[in-house]
Amino acid sequence: MDVRLYAHLPEAATAPGSQRGKAEFQIEARSGLIVRDVIREVGVPSEAVFIVMVNGERLDLDACLADGDRLGLFPAVSGG
């Protein structure tokens, strides 16, 4: 599964062995894997993730994932 972290999320990844600082990486999709599991595995605080995209479709944190999926995680964006 392809995972992409946007904006400041790559620097927020704190899990040991995570791809800290990398915006794109691959993880193995296992049976029953949901978006929330991936967020936990890479160590990104779930409250930092505002938008979840799976294969170009906006989904929630409890969406099931499969091998070959493309997961994009986006933080809230602000500015003026």
Spans of model-derived segments:
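Ubiquitin-like/PB1-type beta-grasp interaction modules and other compact soluble beta-rich domains
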Residues: 1-79
